[in-house]
Amino acid sequence: MCTLFIADLHLSEHEPAITAGFLRFLREDAIQADSLYILGDLFDYWIGDDDNNPLHREIASALKTVQQQGVSCYFIHGNRDFLLGSRFAKESGIILLPQEKVLELYGKRVLILHGDTLCTDDEGYQRYRKRVHTPWIQRLFLLLPLSIRQKIAVKMRANSQSVNRRKSEAIMDVNQQAVIDTFERYQADWMIHGHTHRPFVHEVPLHDKTVYRGVLGAWHHQGSMFKITDKSIDLISFPF
């Protein structure tokens, strides 16, 4: 058996091929795993569990089917779907996790997270993140009519794309000291995250040993997952 990790699918009604690829992944790959961990940005945006549109219902149903077949499904919020809540979790059968979680897998300590908290050089984004994770701001936003929330989400998405085009590639990647500090805080052997869309396995020298940082790819033109067994940890890309 195995444990699977994915992130950054950015599912939306505008990308039906990605949705179809994810549904196929659930039917063919996830169903054979012990557990599936979704490390954020499953959806391109999330404006509340009451946005019960056909895509959300389809994904919830597919995840529920996997869970009913005995595969535990876990979710860590990303920067696009941090408002995903308990109602969707109940409908889909997923288990919501904190933003950082250590797993004991096959004799290794594996830290999982979305990854945006490691990008500390992007000070503008970190200020934004702090604001939108403020509980009273979230509560106020969720009280707005759904149509208003949809308009705000579209405007914020367009603004984010415009701002990111003006940022350097380096500033949007992880800060190495933040990575080291996080490894030390959790005493992990491996770290797996998404967010940066730069799939790779990095060796990180740490005191008298080497630890590993695995980065998941985004599901733009192909799927990306980490597969962990008792014998190996593999970063795998696959066609939709």
Swiss-Prot record:
Tagged with keyword ATP-binding: no
GO cellular component terms given for this protein: cytoplasm; extrinsic component of plasma membrane
Subcellular location: Cell inner membrane
Cofactor note: Binds 2 Mn(2+) ions per subunit in a binuclear metal center.
Keyword flag Metal-binding: yes
Primary localisation category: membrane
Binding locations of Mn(2+) 1: D8, H10, D41, H197
Biological process per Gene Ontology, one example term: lipid A biosynthetic process
Annotated InterPro entries: Calcineurin-like_PHP_ApaH, LpxH-like, Metallo-depent_PP-like, UDP-diacylglucosamine_Hdrlase
Keywords: Cell inner membrane, Cell membrane, Hydrolase, Lipid A biosynthesis, Lipid biosynthesis, Lipid metabolism, Manganese, Membrane, Metal-binding
Binding site for Mn(2+) 2: D41, N79, H114, H195
Record-listed E.C. numbers: 3.6.1.54
Membrane topology annotation: Peripheral membrane protein
Catalysed reactions, semicolon-separated: UDP-2-N,3-O-bis[(3R)-3-hydroxytetradecanoyl]-alpha-D-glucosamine + H2O = 2-N,3-O-bis[(3R)-3-hydroxytetradecanoyl]-alpha-D-glucosaminyl 1-phosphate + UMP + 2 H(+)
The protein's required cofactors: Mn(2+)
GO molecular function: manganese ion binding; UDP-2,3-diacylglucosamine hydrolase activity
Residues noted as binding substrate in the record, renumbered to the chain: N79, R80, D122, S160, N164, K167, H195
Entry's family note: Belongs to the LpxH family.
HAMAP family: LpxH
Protein name stated in the entry: UDP-2,3-diacylglucosamine hydrolase
Organism per entry: Photorhabdus laumondii subsp. laumondii (strain DSM 15139 / CIP 105565 / TT01)
Phylogenetic classification of the source organism: Bacteria, Pseudomonadati, Pseudomonadota, Gammaproteobacteria, Enterobacterales
Encoding gene (name): lpxH
